[in-house]
A protein has these predicted regions:
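Polar, glycine-rich mid-to-C-terminal structural blocks
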Residues: 38, 50, 55-57, 61-123, ...
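Signal peptide-directed extracytoplasmic domains
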Residues: 7-12
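Generic structural motif
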Residues: 34, 84, 138-140
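Mature extracellular/periplasmic domains of secretome proteins
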Residues: 14-21, 44, 69-70
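Conserved functional hotspot residues or short segments at active or partner-binding sites
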Residues: 91-92, 96-304
């Protein structure tokens, strides 16, 4: 039909200049929420063809193609022209721009409206939400306090002073922040009168207002007072509670100052749950093959 003719006009076939170097070597691809567009197409295609295992967190979900168009008075606009589809037939787009809410905002495609597709060996995969890894490694929650440590430049300023007392440090693969360094940073935060908001404290304030409006405050005020005491920021307590994450932030800042981005990356690989899982899977041929096998018979699989 006419539609097929139109589609063929836009078909493009690209070929590599030579034969592939290796078609059987086990591969693991690390992805997370920052993996978008081309990264998702490559990782998703490898998953669809059962050529690699994917490890990490769900990818971003950018499956639309935009083309810029010139406008008068040196203006320009990007127009969505097409969508990305990968070998199984699924689209990786997460945000549904075809259906807008009353206020004009858009939301992600709910899981209930996604469809099942199949890899070349028959493994079920879904569309509409980026690429879901074969092994999910959840990232730890980041407390609000961490955000303020970075945005208030407290880390940067402390490391600038710290570096004046430490002209040389261990190489990236060996360096570790000591407990003494951690305590020094905590003391520095106190001296600089470091303050931070906590979402739990704000939510409690809203809850108290609702309880007062509904008449519960008079009978249960002691409960709210107890909660308020527990949720009031306490620098010593919160520093100690988040010690491991704060030490990681310190380490990252120190590495960037002494060894730049390369050193920071080398050091971070010492404690990387996603990388550790990749090494585990690649080191276990049985687990690797089992991951790529289909759970049962299916009707249609991915093809190139």
């Amino acid at each position: 039909g006419l539609g097929d003719v139109y589609k063929r006009q836009w078909d493009r076939t690209y070929r590599t200049p030579g034969e592939p170097l290796d078609t059987v070597m086990p591969m693991a691809v690390l992805i997370n929420g920052a993996s978008a567009s081309a990264a998702e197409i490559v990782s998703g295609s490898l998953q669809d063809m059962d050529r690699a295992v994917l490890i990490g967190q769900r990818s971003f979900g950018k499956g639309l193609v935009q083309s810029p168009r010139e406008l008068p008075y040196n203006g320009s606009v990007k127009v969505t022209m097409s969508k990305y589809y990968i070998p199984s037939g699924r689209c990786i787009q997460q945000m549904d721009y075809s259906h807008r809410k009353a206020d004009g905002s858009v939301g992600a495609i709910p899981d209930s409206l996604t469809s099942v597709f199949y890899t070349s060996k028959g493994r079920p995969v879904r569309d509409g939400g980026g690429i879901t890894p074969d092994f999910k490694i959840e990232e730890p929650e980041t407390p609000t306090m961490m955000f303020y440590l970075v945005t208030d430049f407290l880390l940067t300023d402390f490391v600038a002073e710290w570096s004046q007392k430490h002209k040389k440090i261990a190489p990236p693969e060996d360096f570790e922040v000591t407990d003494e360094d951690f305590e020094a940073f905590k003391q520095y935060a106190k001296e600089k009168n470091f303050t931070y908001d906590r979402q739990s404290e704000k939510l409690l304030k809203n809850l108290k207002e609702v309880a007062k409006f509904e008449g519960y405050m008079d009978n249960d005020s002691t409960i709210f007072n107890s909660l308020e005491a527990k949720l009031t920021p306490d620098l010593d307590r919160d520093f100690d509670r988040n010690k491991d994450q704060i030490k990681k932030l310190l380490t990252s800042e120190i590495m960037k100052r002494y060894y730049f981005q390369k050193g920071e990356l080398i050091n971070s690989l010492k404690e990387d749950d996603v990388l550790d899982k990749a090494l585990e899977v690649l080191g276990d041929p049985a687990l690797y093959q089992q991951t790529l096998e289909a759970p049962g018979k299916v009707e249609k699989t991915a093809t190139l």
